[in-house]
């Protein structure tokens, strides 16, 4: 079932209904949310494919955001590919994709951590902020029992 959804998403036949692909992204995101690693892999690979329309890429970002939101209260080590993918999207050629990925990433920092990122800046100006996002990611995705693990404050 998951493989079939992946086929629907990756099928770039322009005659295919975009809404069918959109819905496949949505359903696959539901599976990915519950640690279905094959579903996560399909989504994280597809969202980086710049040949997809913004419409589909936004739905793919929404799909991985569900998994990311479940990761926020706990350790992010096991699903670190989701965070790494969102950070890669900060350097995407599409400013809308960069901005949406940034909105999702900020949720993991309680909207505090912007790290100076502005999706409208040019590639060179974005690099310092992306390095700060990568530094943050290396801390929050550290294995739970490692020396690098940062304990999150209780609310």
Cite the ranges covered by each PLM segment.
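Terminal, low-structured helical/coil segments at or just beyond the last alpha-helical repeat
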Residues: 114-155
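Short, solvent-exposed loop/turn elements at domain surfaces
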Residues: 13, 98, 142-146
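Short amphipathic alpha-helical segments that mediate assembly, nucleic-acid/protein binding
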Residues: 2, 21, 39-40, 57, ...
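Structural detector for internal amphipathic alpha-helices that build alpha-solenoid repeat scaffolds
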Residues: 18-35, 55-76, 96-110
